[in-house]
Amino acid sequence: FPPWVL
């Protein structure tokens, strides 16, 4: 998943 979902 991309980092902006964290």
UniProtKB/Swiss-Prot annotation:
Compartmental location: Secreted
UniProtKB keywords: Amidation, Amphibian defense peptide, Secreted
Keyword match Kinase: no
GO CC term, one of those recorded: extracellular region
TM stretches of this protein: none
Record family assignment: Belongs to the frog skin active peptide (FSAP) family. Tryptophillin subfamily.
Protein name: Tryptophyllin-14
Organism classification: Eukaryota, Metazoa, Chordata, Craniata, Vertebrata
